[in-house]
DNA sequence: GCCTAGGTCCCGTCT
DNA sequence: AGACGGGGCCTAGGC
């Protein structure tokens, strides 16, 4: 099913890639190339052997010798192929990104294949799962906590969980499924302030940050603002 | 130079990949596989044809049919290869990430190559370039602005540019080289508050957000807090 | 070592 | 369409 060329000429490789893309196949090119990105930010890749993947959604990624992220990429397309001066693959990534041009002086291997089925994924352990867990067992936040609404809207944005504590005090809960940083504290602070403005003037409002952990600076920020931290991890995570 | 196998058995592919990695080569495997990630977050990829890249830094990325990001990945290693039940590539990504296992029921193409030179990049148009531009022409921020220090430290973190406005008022400048969101406004707010606490009690402190543009909500946030927005783009960007 | 900030962030979701 | 927030974000730099 997959087709492969070894050491093709630029013309052959260009025709091969164009035909494969027209058939909805993924194209893998391995070879020596240079790349330039022109746009808001300018990036140039010196000559080196890399892997280019041209996916059926017209995403182009260029992977180098290290790292999870591609050395260069573009999506938004369309993708154009040219064989005038070596094989050149180009794609315009739109206004915010820029235009990518990859020029191969030698293609070692060109492969085209049908990426059938390569999409279905199942995920767990996200913030949504943490929310489900807290709604199922509100005492995890603190004993007596009662959720009343999720995504309750305020002028500062939607509150993850809105409810009352054991004393009946209005409480905003902000969820993070990873260790929380200062941004989470100020977001919670904005929600609490918005609730105080929204409710009648002398209303007491509490804020609780629910996350597996917080950074030291965030813990101080919370304390300074009279906010509470409650350690809860998403279900199924190893640290329980 | 690059070596290629077509439709190898699991044993052959495993030996091929192991040898290539030992030689510091990059390995590309194209074939039908399933993948599982176990850790804080659980992710499962159903059977599909994908590209696996095993890089010389022991990063493993698995690319599917769409998107810039890999469907699965691991780094931190070490990477292990096993041929007991189809070709299996595994890598432990550490505590926060999890362990990745990719099992191929069929390898269509296995390629190994030396990713020589695939590292050098030059970049421009970043926040650093915007800073250079502002330091070179401070009037871009506003007429009469005088930079005094960069990365000036405060309890809330380092201020991009610290200086005085035309009236001599202490001013904190926060730079963003892309359209700024609410996080930039609250970051600037934290810096201004920290400066007010640090300097003598009745000190006036201004805050200016310098970016090519801001979102509407951010513009309101800034106005509510008495902060200023000054539109400046990084040098060489298309919108000047 | 942890933590913070930047990114062509990407990507989903909602207005 | 733009906009906002989450992410196994990744990656570089600072302490």
From Swiss-Prot, chains A, B:
Q: Which HAMAP family match?
A: NucS
Q: What does this protein do?
A: Cleaves both 3' and 5' ssDNA extremities of branched DNA structures.
Matching entries from PANTHER family are given as: ENDONUCLEASE NUCS
Organism the protein comes from = Halobacterium salinarum (strain ATCC 700922 / JCM 11081 / NRC-1) (Halobacterium halobium)
What name is this protein filed under?
A: Endonuclease NucS 1
Q: Does the keyword Nuclease apply?
A: yes
* UniProt keyword Hydrolase present: yes
Name the principal localization, coarsely classed.
cytoplasm
- Which enzyme class, named as a word? hydrolase
Please report which protein family the annotation says this sequence is part of: Belongs to the NucS endonuclease family.
The source's superkingdom equals: Archaea
Keywords carried by this UniProt record: Cytoplasm, DNA-binding, Endonuclease, Hydrolase, Nuclease
State the compartments where it is located: Cytoplasm
* Gene it is expressed from: nucS1
GO CC annotation = cytoplasm
Q: Which GO terms describe its molecular function?
A: DNA binding; single-stranded DNA endodeoxyribonuclease activity
InterPro entries given in the database record = Endonuclease_NucS (IPR002793), NucS_C (IPR048301), NucS_N (IPR048302), NucS_N_sf (IPR049173), TonB_box_CS (IPR010916), tRNA_endonuc-like_dom_sf (IPR011856)
Q: EC no.? A: 3.1.-.-
């Amino acid at each position: 099913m997959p087709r492969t060329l070894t050491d093709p000429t630029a013309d052959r490789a260009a025709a091969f890639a164009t035909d494969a893309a027209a058939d909805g196949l993924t194209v893998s090119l391995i070879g020596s190339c240079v790349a330039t990105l022109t746009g808001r930010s300018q990036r140039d890749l010196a000559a080196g052997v890399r892997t280019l993947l041209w996916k059926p959604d017209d995403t182009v990624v260029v992977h180098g010798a290290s790292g999870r992220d591609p050395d260069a990429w573009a999506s938004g397309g369309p993708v154009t192929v040219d064989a005038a001066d070596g094989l050149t693959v180009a794609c315009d990534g739109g206004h915010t990104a820029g235009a990518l041009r990859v020029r191969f002086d030698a293609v070692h291997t060109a492969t085209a294949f049908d990426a059938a089925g390569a999409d279905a994924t199942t995920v767990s352990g996200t913030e949504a799962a943490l929310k489900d867990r807290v709604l199922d067992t509100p005492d995890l936040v603190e004993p007596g906590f009662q959720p009343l609404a999720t995504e309750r809207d305020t002028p500062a944005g939607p509150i993850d969980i809105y409810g009352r504590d054991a004393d009946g005090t209005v409480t905003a809960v902000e969820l993070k499924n990873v260790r929380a940083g200062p941004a989470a504290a100020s977001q919670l602070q904005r929600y609490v302030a918005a609730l105080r403005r929204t409710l009648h003037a002398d209303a007491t409002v509490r804020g609780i940050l629910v996350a597996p952990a917080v950074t030291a600076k965030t813990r101080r920020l919370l304390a300074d603002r009279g906010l509470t931290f409650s350690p809860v991890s998403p279900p199924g995570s190893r640290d329980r």
